[in-house]
């Protein structure tokens, strides 16, 4: 399956409230209209960071992330907008977002106990590699972190699914009114390492199981920077997987 995970912040040229309003009421609807006719599209999910694990093992830290987008395609396919559609999307970024980091990823399902549930709570871990650390070395550390999470979830009440995503590349973006709004190609190199997506029946079970991973700064490693453990509000504007 082809998969893209994008990350972005609310543009500083608008208030956070206006960015949220425009993104949910305008941008997502536009994306639905553009993506729905694509025969290769499997799903389009929007993720909002609503909480972050803190050094006490609780969830009182203000999230260091705003929103993510997760797109899945049939094998061998990826996002395929026309030049005109790409420009329309980029121009709309001005109204709500910047610092876009869109990455093709390779996913590996480490745990899957989903069986008919219609509502789940999502958690995510993101990471970049530190200066001077090569991509393979950073990935080894991140994969070891994924194994730690798997170990926690194996015996955790309400744990349903764990996916580890290795970043393959990152889109290069140029500014319109501020940085990171118009995609123009691929970066020669990316510092983004990967994403972990963890699903539980309820936020309580996920917070109780995963919060301990951040206690005392235990998520830290010299090979990684920007390691954030987030609780996510996920929506599915499009899903044709059945």
Which residues fall in each region the model found?
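Macromolecular interaction modules
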Residues: 1-242
């Amino acid at each position: 399956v082809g998969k893209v995970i994008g990350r972005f912040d609310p543009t500083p040229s608008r208030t956070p409230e206006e960015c949220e309003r425009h993104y949910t009421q305008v941008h997502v609807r536009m994306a639905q209209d553009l993506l729905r006719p694509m025969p290769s599209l499997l799903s389009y999910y929007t993720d909002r960071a609503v909480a972050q694990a803190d050094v006490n093992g609780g969830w009182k830290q203000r999230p260091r992330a705003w929103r993510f987008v997760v797109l899945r395609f049939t094998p061998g396919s990826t996002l395929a907008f026309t030049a005109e559609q790409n420009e329309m999307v980029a121009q709309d970024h001005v109204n709500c977002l910047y610092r876009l980091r869109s990455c093709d990823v390779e996913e590996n399902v480490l745990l899957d106990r989903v069986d008919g549930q219609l509502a789940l709570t999502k958690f995510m871990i993101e990471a970049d590699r530190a200066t001077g650390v090569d991509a393979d070395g950073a990935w080894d550390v991140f994969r070891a972190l994924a194994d730690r999470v798997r170990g926690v979830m194996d015996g955790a009440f309400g744990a349903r699914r764990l996916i580890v995503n290795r970043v393959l590349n990152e889109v290069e973006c140029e500014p319109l009114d501020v940085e990171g709004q118009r995609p123009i190609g691929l970066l020669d190199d990316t510092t983004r390492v990967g994403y972990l997506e963890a699903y539980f029946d309820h936020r309580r079970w996920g917070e109780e199981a995963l919060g301990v991973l951040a206690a005392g700064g235990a998520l830290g490693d010299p090979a990684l920077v920007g390691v954030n453990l987030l609780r996510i509000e996920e929506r599915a504007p499009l899903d044709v997987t059945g």
